[in-house]
Design a protein with these regions (language model features):
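Glycine-rich phosphate/adenosyl-contacting loop at the front of the ribokinase-like
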Residues: 1-49
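Acidic-glycine-rich active-site phosphate/pyrophosphate-binding loop
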Residues: 5-18, 169-191, 263
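Charged C-terminal helix
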Residues: 8-11, 233-263
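Short, small-residue alpha-helix embedded
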Residues: 136, 200-229
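Short, well-structured alpha-helical segments that form the helix of a local strand-helix-strand
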Residues: 159-164, 220-235, 253
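Short pre-catalytic strand/loop immediately N-terminal to key active-site residues, enriched for Gly-Thr
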Residues: 161, 189-200
Length: 263
């Protein structure tokens, strides 16, 4: 196993961003209601084309025409879960990359059951969660009290590696330092700011951004690494000029728009 050391990671991230701007990939998001507006605006900010369809009557058709699918467990409902599975199976058949955010997966048996079905039937390309969510998914233990992790990322690195191998996917563990692995390779993202955790939908936005990078980069670990790097850089820059949560949200969108500005 080895850590991914990339001297020109920002340059490579910008190569992906340039491809996103040129190709304007269609990213199908089935995310929670709280996050939909911010996720869509963030994807537009980097040049992607978001669509937020969730009706089971159309999700298969839309996913089949999309360049990536982003699924989110944030506000689980039986109808939404069914839509996610239908969309995921359609994407899988077309070999369209899928990123699945296992929000609060350890909080209830309902969430764990939905997550297990999506993983079993849709085989996500990337699974994303904070430390406690990834630990819960690995152990199938219920009892996590919230969706914010108070564990350090390093505590679940070994579990993330094992889970990545077991599920043949990329695992993204978010935290003060983000950890990305395919079970063999590892990458760390040190950028970011604590203010990001005070703005709702930041995590859901990261999931959508990962989807956009997956649409243009065929290496899912590299795509996830670059996406989280972009989130972190934009977050740091936004925080440096923000007075509170409101300005942080607006500044973050502006900084996503301006990630290519220093070229």
């Amino acid at each position: 196993m080895g850590t991914v050391y990339i001297n020109n990671v920002v340059k490579q991230m910008k190569t992906d961003l340039r491809l996103i701007q040129e190709q304007q990939p269609l990213i199908h998001n089935i995310t929670n209601y709280v996050a939909m507006n911010f996720v869509a605006n963030s994807l537009l900010a980097i040049g992607a084309s978001p669509i937020m369809a969730r009706a089971e009557e159309e999700v298969e058709e839309i996913s089949s025409k999309s360049n990536a699918l982003a699924l989110n467990l944030g506000v689980p409902e039986s109808t939404t879960a069914h839509s996610m599975i239908l969309a995921g199976e359609a994407a899988m058949k077309k070999r369209i990359p899928i990123v699945f955010d296992v929000v609060g997966v350890g909080a209830t048996r309902f969430r764990m059951d939905i997550a297990s079905q999506i993983i079993l039937r849709c085989h996500p390309t990337v699974i994303k969660g904070n430390a406690s969510e990834i630990q819960a998914l690995y152990s199938h233990q219920i009892g996590m009290l919230g969706v914010d992790s108070h564990q350090e990322t390093y505590e679940v690195e070994e579990q993330a590696k094992k889970l990545a191998k077991q599920l043949s996917c990329i695992i993204v563990v978010t935290g003060a330092i983000d950890f990305i692995t395919d079970g063999e390779r590892m990458a760390y993202v040190h950028e970011g700011h604590s203010m990001m955790s005070k703005v709702t939908a930041m995590g859901c936005t990261a999931t959508g951004i990962v989807g956009a990078f997956l649409a243009v980069n065929s290496d899912p670990l590299e795509a996830s690494f670059h996406a989280m790097k972009a989130m972190g850089i934009a977050g740091e820059r936004a925080a440096s000029q923000s007075r509170g949560n409101g300005s942080m949200m607006i500044n973050f969108l502006d900084e996503l728009c301006n990630l290519m500005a220093d070229d």
